[in-house]
UniProtKB/Swiss-Prot annotation:
This is Chromosomal replication initiator protein DnaA. One of its GO terms (molecular function) is DNA replication origin binding. Residues 73-126 are annotated as: Domain II. ATP binds at G174, G176, K177, T178. GO terms for biological process: DNA replication; DNA replication initiation; regulation of DNA replication. InterPro entries: AAA+_ATPase (IPR003593), Chromosome_initiator_DnaA (IPR001957), Chromosome_initiator_DnaA-like (IPR020591), Chromosome_initiator_DnaA_CS (IPR018312), DnaA_C (IPR013159), DnaA_dom (IPR013317), DnaA_N_dom (IPR024633), DnaA_N_sf (IPR038454). The gene is dnaA. Residues 89-122 are annotated as: Disordered. Domain I is involved in oligomerization and binding regulators, domain II is flexibile and of varying length in different bacteria, domain III forms the AAA+ region, while domain IV binds dsDNA. GO terms for cellular component: cytoplasm; plasma membrane. It holds the Pfam family DnaA_N.
Length: 470
């Protein structure tokens, strides 16, 4: 892809983001890539068939119109699924079939890329990447708690009391959620004691729908509920009322039986608006951990880890420290961009038989160096910071209390939610204890009027904004 095409693609993505909103863009379009541009057609790719089907069914016209705003001659968008080429271990010999009167559940066999225990082999699941283990996970300030909680789950034994259930990890794209979930699965399946199953939400949906079609839903449910540790990735993609109901039943059954559930998504439970309230409530009742953005020190550590991994197969490959610092300082979006940068330098160095230099790095990764995006502020962050500022609790802000020491902080928090987020008035009201949108509008207008004439309050509000934007 040349520079002009990359620039055009960036503008199209900006139009698409503005058109559908930040949340929808992150859920459905963040992993969409540009593959090719012809005279009247554009070829895009996504990592899964589910994403392809969903975008084609719900957003095809929107994507086309965004392209036509940049290239009026484009009349067709071709959406393809990227292939993830990984070596697959030879399949093990299948055990002898056992007679049963009940039809078998739809197969959920994992295409694992390294040897796993018999338990994992029998249970199956979504494909696992052998690189995504605890040994290769780089720990930093933004992921320490998530890593510790995941290790605690992975090191548990059958019959041990379950401390965090469910363990719910949320973060943006490329910040390490899937790495931790697969690390839990690899570690849990390293022995023969527990049954650990890793599934994407997409695989869960396909499995359940297939079970309904083949009239094996009961066997499907029993197979899932026999798991010791159920690991579900990308929960934001769970769609359909019947599928969500089954997921809720499975979640409740496993937790009530003392089995561990680990879940990852790109947002906290309260933001999964497509999910039933019962599911969100159960998810919020466990340990909810956010993995924050990667700081420069952590990015540097990830880069060094990726160089070391590459050197295991290419002994002469080396990246000077000044190049690592440059990459860590300028590639700030996510860990996948960092890994992509190392892969580019490796390819360029090996194919051209040249050492890696700072000049080469600046040239090869320039499209990964993105303008610093403004911090995405969440309503939960606003409530937390305001509660701390005014020495009240978050539950006070959400309560029906009308005392002066609670009403003013609540109004300030609602005002900040309206001015610093893209949430609608009804949504803000729901986040503040189920209040009506008119209550939010009154609070916003009240604070707007006060800050224009109350210097002290104006300074307080500006201080809160700075704290939230840091």
């Amino acid at each position: 892809m040349n520079t002009s095409e990359q620039d055009r693609w960036s503008r199209v993505k900006g139009r698409l983001r503005s058109s559908v909103g930040e949340d929808i863009y992150t859920s459905w379009f963040a992993r969409m890539d540009l593959e090719d541009v012809q005279d009247e057609s554009v070829r895009l790719s996504v990592p899964t068939r589910f994403l392809k089907s969903w975008i084609q069914a719900h957003y095809a016209e929107r994507v086309l119109s965004c392209w036509q705003a940049e290239m009026p001659e484009v009349h067709r968008i071709d959406l393809t699924v990227r292939s993830a080429v990984r070596p697959v271990a030879p399949p093990k010999e299948a055990p002898a079939p056992v007679e049963t009167r009940r039809a078998p559940a739809p197969e959920l066999r994992s295409t694992a890329t390294a040897p796993v225990s018999a338990n994992h082999d029998a249970l199956g699941g979504s494909p696992l990447d052998p690189r995504l283990t605890f040994a290769s996970f780089v720990i930093g300030r933004s992921n320490t708690l998530a890593h510790a909680a995941a290790r605690q789950v992975a090191e548990g034994r059958r019959g041990d009391p379950v401390m965090f259930n469910p363990l719910y990890i949320h973060a943006g794209v490329g910040l390490g959620k899937t790495h931790l979930l697969q690390a839990v699965t690899w570690a849990g399946n390293s022995g023969n004691e527990r049954k650990v199953l890793y599934l994407t939400a997409e695989k869960f949906m396909y499995g359940f729908v297939a079970a309904l079609k083949t009239q094996t839903a009961l066997a499907f449910k029993e197979a899932l509920r026999g798991i010791d540790v159920l690991v579900i990735d990308d929960l934001q993609f769970l769609q359909g009322k019947s599928t969500q109901a089954e997921f809720c039943h499975t979640l409740n059954a496993l937790i009530d039986a003392g089995r561990q559930v680990v879940i990852a998504a790109d947002r906290p439970p309260s933001d999964l608006e497509s999910l039933d309230d019962r599911v969100r409530s159960r998810l919020a009742g466990g340990l909810v951990v956010e993995m924050g953005s990667l700081g420069e020190e952590l990015r540097h550590g990830i880069l060094k880890s990726r160089v070391a991994a590459a050197r295991a197969h290419h002994a002469t490959f080396d990246v000077p420290e000044e190049v690592l610092h440059y990459l860590a300082r300028t590639i700030t979006h996510n860990g996948r961009d960092l890994e992509g940068a190392i892969n580019r330098l490796l390819a360029h160095s090996k194919l051209n038989n040249q050492p890696v230099t700072l000049e080469m790095a600046e040239r090869e990764v320039r499209d990964l160096v993105r303008p610093q995006e403004p911090k995405r502020i969440k309503i939960e962050d606003i409530q937390r910071v305001v509660a701390r500022q005014y020495n009240v609790s978050r539950s006070d802000l959400l309560s029906s209390r009308r005392t002066a020491n609670v009403v003013r902080p609540r109004q300030v928090a609602m005002y900040l939610a309206k001015t610093l987020t893209l949430r609608s008035l009804p949504e803000i009201g729901r986040r503040f204890g189920g209040r009506d949108h008119t209550t939010v509008l009154h609070a916003v207008r009240k604070i707007e009027a006060l800050v224009s004439k109350d210097t002290a309050l104006s300074e307080e509000v500006e201080s809160l904004k700075r704290q939230l934007q840091e």
